[in-house]
Design a protein with these regions (language model features):
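Beta-strand-rich domains and repeat architectures in extracellular enzymes and scaffolds
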Residues: 22-58
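A short helix->beta-strand "capping" segment at the edge of beta-propeller domains
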Residues: 17-28, 70, 184-193
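Short loop/turn segments that connect beta-strands within beta-propeller blades
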Residues: 64-68, 108-112, 175-178, 234-238, ...
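Residue-level detector of Asp-centered blade-edge/turn motifs that repeat once per structural unit
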Residues: 37-38, 87-88, 131-132, 207-208, ...
Length: 559
């Protein structure tokens, strides 16, 4: 059953002012935002639909912190992403495949022609500027081995499952003051790590630029993600030392400002980490005992930045994603809690006086904000106006609803209803179930993605998006409720939510449907064999047979 079946479950109601499906998909939305080290500009990505290429494309924009109109920085048919400011705020490195293969490019924040820095056979992955701004480190699988090239020429291009992977390693490239746009001769990158022992993931430069801390697992295969440990490599002589090795995954290292310690994400030696709280560990740069910080935050967390003021990170608290700060030995403090906003990441300027982030309040669209953290009562100041593109339309409203599941578990969800909602009327109900299971639905408005929610509502339906057991935002105990109960407990949560809305009197229970992707698809599939109350169910990328899933998946520990 597809989306067309779902759409015709109900009659068209009140189409005036509602965006069309094409308009809903065409609305622009902000993404990654990073403030310049000098605190004067913010670079951020904007996603929009390219109907000719049949895909979403993101480009980079600049917003002046002092105010003024934002301006577009990159253009073209290929997306530009992962912007990184040089330490002197004069250049931005970003990734794009505009020449056919993903490479690292450079551009001035004032505009002009972007130039490619790298010309690697294997596209670079993550990258970071060195503290002095003279070099950039990145991850890459490097050139294709000769034996693999010979095999392709002789037998064709195929892959031997779980054998033909290539380890990702650290590379460093010098950044010249100028790179002629037309030049095919790019600076030569040098491998800093090598071999078959590990595959590099996240990394961070030491403050003095002489070392790089990185995480690495046995291989790049998903099933080996739990083997990730923390290492330090000296750039000059390429000497590698493992400094953290626990039973669970350790990843995402960041250096302390004095270069003496490293913070990282850790499962705290727990191999059963899928539903457990990820913690922040701190270890001496030379290795030693690991100290766990911010243990009082009951959510899955990891360090984003370590500055003089402390370790900054984000964490969900119910339906809000907040920004926190903690110092080793201290308790975590939530910043900007009084603003009532949910922050999608964030970045700090060099002095920690300004914070830039994409954020939103309930029933509002995400916008780019900047906050003066030195103010007595810091408040976000909006730099963009994405909401203006919705001004001619009458978008649906979001309401947070709560109910008790079959076993007494407290469940939250988002009820999406027409702007002219009348509780005395009967509406068809569509249940849209997120994936994960550690995803989360919030009362924020957003441009339509997988499902045309605004069209569903414009056609006369109400939509329930349940945060069933296992969802993010409600702590480790809540996530553990579907352990050895997957599908069953989730179904209780969905159906008890449906019953709750029916009890409020505005749901036509003869016209109900369900849909979801991944874990949401699995729950929808589970509903097909456990209830006949839905007229239509759509299963997207959902597990329908655990036995075939186990023998085919590359993440067997999830089962």
């Amino acid at each position: 059953m597809g989306r067309t079946t779902i759409l015709f479950l109900f009659a068209a109601v009140c189409l005036a002012q509602a965006p069309t499906a094409e308009q809903s998909l065409s609305f622009k939305s902000p993404g990654t935002a990073r403030i310049s080290p000098d605190g004067t500009l913010v670079v951020y990505s904007v996603r929009e639909a390219d109907w000719e290429q049949n895909e979403f494309v993101s480009q980079l924009w600049i917003a002046p912190v002092s105010g003024g109109a934002p301006y577009q920085l990159t253009r073209g048919k290929s997306s530009a992403g992962n912007p990184r400011w040089s330490p002197d705020s004069k250049r931005i490195a970003f990734s794009t495949s505009r020449d056919g293969k993903g490479q690292i490019w450079l551009i001035s924040p004032t505009g002009g022609e972007a130039v490619a820095l790298t010309n690697e056979e294997a596209s670079p992955g993550g990258f970071k500027w060195s503290p002095g701004g003279k070099r950039i480190a990145f991850t890459s699988a490097g050139p294709e081995p000769k034996e693999l090239k010979d095999r392709k020429e002789k037998y064709g291009d195929f892959e031997i499952y779980q054998e033909d992977y290539r380890q990702s390693h650290l590379w460093v490239v010098d950044v010249p003051e100028e790179i002629p746009a037309a030049s095919k001769h790019k600076p030569k990158a040098v491998a800093i790590t090598s071999g078959k022992e590990f595959s590099v993931g996240g990394f961070d430069w030491s403050p003095d630029g002489t070392r790089i801390a990185f995480s690495a697992s046995k291989s790049p295969l998903l099933i080996d993600g739990g083997t990730s440990d923390i290492y330090v490599v000296t750039v000059a002589d390429k000497a590698v030392k493992k400094i953290v090795a626990t039973a669970g995954p350790d990843s995402g290292p960041v250096w302390s400002p004095d270069g003496k310690q490293i913070a990282f994400s850790t499962a705290n030696a727990d191999p059963y980490f899928f539903y457990k709280n990820g913690r922040i560990g701190v270890v001496a740069a030379e290795g030693g005992p690991v100290q766990i910080v911010a243990n009082e935050v009951d959510e899955d967390i990891g360090p984003a930045e370590w500055r003089k003021g402390g370790i900054y990170f984000s964490a969900w608290k119910n339906l809000e994603n907040g920004i926190y700060k903690v110092t080793p030995g201290g308790r975590a403090v939530r910043l900007l809690a009084s603003t009532g906003m949910s922050y999608m990441g964030g970045s700090l300027d060099e002095t920690e006086s300004k914070l830039a982030a994409v954020a939103a309040k309930p029933n509002a669209y995400p916008e780019l904000y900047v906050v003066d953290l030195t103010a007595s009562n810091p408040q976000p100041r909006k730099l963009t106006d994405f909401a203006a593109q919705y001004s001619k339309h009458n978008p649906a409203n979001r309401e947070v609803v709560r109910w008790k599941s079959k076993d007494g578990a407290e469940i939250e969800g988002i009820l999406i209803k027409p702007a002219d909602f009348d509780p005395s009327k009967k509406y068809p109900l569509l249940v849209v179930i997120h994936g994960g299971p550690t995803g989360i639905d919030t009362p924020l408005r957003s441009a339509d993605g997988t499902y045309p929610i605004e069209r569903f509502v414009a056609k006369g339906a109400v939509v329930l998006r349940p945060n069933y057991r296992g969802s993010a935002g409600y702590g480790e105990k809540f996530r553990s409720l579907n352990v050895r109960n997957l599908g069953v407990g989730d179904m209780w949560d969905v159906m008890s939510g449906v019953d709750y809305l029916i009890s409020r009197g505005f749901v036509d229970e003869t016209r109900m449907g369900s849909m979801g992707w991944s874990q949401g698809g699995y729950i929808s599939a589970f509903l097909t064999t456990n209830t006949s109350r839905f007229k239509a169910i759509s299963v997207g990328a959902g597990i329908s047979d655990w036995m075939t899933y186990y023998v085919n998946t590359d993440i067997t520990p999830f089962t």
